[in-house]
Structures are given as C-alpha cells and as structure tokens.
UniProtKB/Swiss-Prot annotation:
Keywords: DNA recombination, DNA-binding, Metal-binding, Transposition, Zinc. One of its GO terms (biological process) is DNA recombination. Zn(2+) binds at C333, C336, C352, C355. It holds the Pfam family Cas12f1-like_TNB. NCBIfam families: guided_TnpB, IS200/IS605 family accessory protein TnpB-like domain. In the N-terminal section; belongs to the transposase 2 family. In the C-terminal section; belongs to the transposase 35 family. It comes from the Viruses. It comes from Acidianus two-tailed virus (ATV). This is TnpB-like protein ORF409.
Length: 409
C-alpha cells in the first residue's frame, strides 16, 4: 500500500512552542555535524558513512551532549535518515551534495511509530453536517501536548510516522503518514491532452479551459508593502520578527490557495479521464529566457507544482500521467502537421497557411500533445476559443473566477 500524508493544523501553549523551536535548532546542529563527519570520513577513507553508521553517530552525539538529550532518541535517528536520503539522491545524480542547513530553515521533527500518543479525541460542534471536525489531544515524547484539529478520518493503527512542523508563519502542523489505499475510481476509457499556459492556466483537448487566477500578481502591491515594512525594522528586533511573520503568512496564504486549486484540478481529471497527457516542460530554461514580468507570471503559475500534484492525484486514484516532448506543439497544425515557425506569442489564433485550419493556438497545442501520446484527437468542429469549465462540474468545491481575499497578519 502507498504511504499517504494527512496534514492537520495544531495548537500548543507558549512553553511547548518555545521547546519546539529549541529542538528544531538542535536538530539542525546534529544534521550539520553528520554532514561534516561524512565529508571527513570520505576524505580520509575514500568512503562515506552508511545509514547504520550515521544513525549510531547521531545517538552518540545525543549521549555526549545533555542539550541533544532533549530530542527524542528515535527523532534523532530520523535526522540521520534524512541526511542519508539526501546523500543517496546525490549519488544517483538527482541532486547536489546536501548543503549545510541554516537553523531558521529547519522546520520539522519526525517521530516514527513510537514516541507519540493520542490522549483524547472529541467532536466539535459545527454548523455543517458534512464537515465534522474533531479535536485530538496528541502527546509527543520530550516535547509536549498539541491540540490537533482533525477534519478527516484516518486509521490510527496504520500510522507509520508523525511529523510536527513549525512554518515560517509560526503556525504548527501535524502530519500523519498512513499506510492506506485510496478507493480506485471507475475507468472512463478517456484520454485528454493538456496545454498549460499563462493567460489560461490549462486548456484541454476536449475544448475546455481553466482561467489563471494570478493570485501572486494580484497581491503584489500588498506583498511589496510588507517587504518595505520588514526592511524598515531593526534586524532581529522584536518588531522585525513580527513583520517577518506577517510577510510569511501572506506568502503562505498564496501558496495554500494555489495548492488547493491544483489538488481540485487533479481530482477532477482523475474522475473524468484514465490518462492525462502533459508537456515535459523544462521550467528553468523557460524562466531564464523570459523577461521580468513573464518570469513573475511563470513563478506564479508554478508549472512543476501543477504537474507534481496532477501526477500525485492521478496515481492515488489508479490513473496515469504521460509526458511528451513540448517542442513546436503550438506551431504545428494538428490537422495536417505543417509547422508554422513564424508564429509569435502575440498570435493567439493559429491559422494554418497550408490547409486553412483556424483555431485557438492553445487548443491546437493540446491536440498536438494528445497526438504525441499515441492517441488520435477528434478533430470535430469547435469554436475559435475553448469553452471554460463549468462550475457545476467540480467535485469538492467550485473554482472561483477570482482569488480569495488577501489577508495580512
């Protein structure tokens, strides 16, 4: 069964939050010590430390320093596992060698199957009959007690890990990693090609599109004010930290808004299609070639995050994501295959000089994407502009035409 992470908002008293911050700082020190030890043994013996050796070294550090004993022993071993996993990605050529971590960028502690205990669970009265919530009282070893707002049921006996995270916005989240199988959605025997863009978030080969809400661009003036307010404060002063938290909460709001939209999109496509085809876009190359405003919009859309969430949702429900070569998808006529190399970004309508095929350029690209996956797109007559997705089609919430209000603080 696949591991599924379920995240909940949590609350704790001030002493527990202070202890969490202190343990996160100590965890970062242990990680950096393991990193330098691995480099030392590699330079001396020509071989780095194994997973078992890293775990043992982490436990030895805990025995030697009373400060490190404040962290639960198995949470210390998980720090060693985190470094080993990062090093393994480097050895496979997937990432660079793990860098030294900064204390203010170490956000989480991991508890395995032991070290945590549910003390109490009780229901909360809400107006909605569908969205029933519970308050779970969770105790973490050597740390404290947290009140967790549980909005989704999950099997406690199948929990493999518990992760406590303190975000830059000073909010606490508890994640339960559960060994759980999601119910597989029925097969539809349908395949769709998707072209992602900036004007429209995505366009399908069925002639539908999702508008780009541009949450970051709309909130740009307010985030600039928060940046200016932070720069006016004395570095590391009490007011500087308050301004920093306000800015972090603003960005967290935008991040959560975008993630919520992408999760709903992934669920929608998993319900309506068996195979989703997208372009294998190299975002770094695309950003490097763009001008300033275009770069901002590319970062706002976050193509890689969209693709990752789409793949996660499709796999979760037993569906498939395919990636194809993005070269000339907009310039190639989906009807006759002619490549119109003089097509510019300003040309929103594709007119084929060879066969006369006239269609929205993004819709034409989505047809070519579908074609490259091995499926033949239905070239039925359509309007020049694709039709938008209807709100009633959404399951689990409608996609609004405007971003939700931007909140500060």
């Amino acid at each position: 069964m696949p591991d599924v992470g379920i995240r909940f908002r949590a609350f704790a008293d001030e002493p527990t939050i202070r202890e969490l911050k202190s343990q996160l700082r100590l965890a970062c020190e242990i990680y950096n010590t393991l990193r330098w030890a691995d480099i030392y043994f590699y330079q001396r013996d020509g071989k780095g430390l194994s997973k078992t050796e890293l775990r043992q070294l982490a436990l030895d550090l805990r025995k030697q320093d009373d400060e490190y004993k404040r962290i639960y022993s198995q949470a210390v071993q998980q720090i060693a596992d985190r470094f080993y996993d990062a090093k393994k990605r480097f050895l496979k050529g997937l990432a660079r060698y793990p860098r030294e971590k900064k204390p203010h960028k170490w956000y989480s502690l991991v508890y395995p199957q032991s070290g945590w205990k549910v003390l109490e669970t009780r229901e909360i009265r809400t107006k909605s009959k569908k969205n029933k919530k519970k308050i779970m009282t969770l105790q973490l070893a050597n740390l404290g007690v947290f009140k967790v707002i549980v909005h989704r049921d999950f099997p406690l006996d199948k929990v493999k890990r518990v992760i406590v995270k303190l975000t830059p916005s000073e909010r606490v989240y508890i994640s339960f990693v559960v060994d759980q199988e999601y119910p597989q959605l029925p097969k539809t025997n349908k395949t769709v090609g998707i072209d992602v863009g900036i004007e429209k978030l995505l366009i399908t080969s069925d002639g539908e599109y999702v508008p780009n809400l541009r949450p970051y661009e709309k909130a740009l003036n307010k985030t600039r004010k928060l940046h200016k307010a932070l720069s006016r404060k004395k570095f590391l002063s009490h007011n500087w930290f308050k301004a920093k938290i306000k800015l972090a909460r603003a960005y967290e709001h935008l991040k959560n808004l975008r993630r919520d939209i992408y999760m709903k999109l992934g669920k929608y496509f998993a319900e309506h299609y068996d195979v989703v085809v997208m372009e294998d876009i190299q975002v770094k190359q695309l950003v490097g070639k763009s001008y300033k405003k275009m770069r901002m919009r590319l970062h706002d859309v976050a193509f890689y995050e969209l693709r990752s969430i789409m793949e996660y949702q499709l796999r979760k429900y037993g569906k498939e994501l395919r990636l194809v070569d993005p070269a000339f998808t907009s310039m190639t006529c989906a009807k006759c295959g002619y490549v119109k190399k003089d097509l510019t970004l300003a040309d929103r309508i594709f007119v084929c000089p060879k066969c006369g095929w006239t269609v929205d350029r993004d819709y034409n690209a989505s047809l070519n994407i579908l074609k490259r996956s091995g499926w033949e797109p239905p070239l039925a007559p359509v309007e020049l502009r694709p039709l938008p997705l209807v709100k009633s089609q959404w399951q689990g919430g409608a996609l609004k035409q405007e971003a939700s209000p931007f909140r500060v603080g």
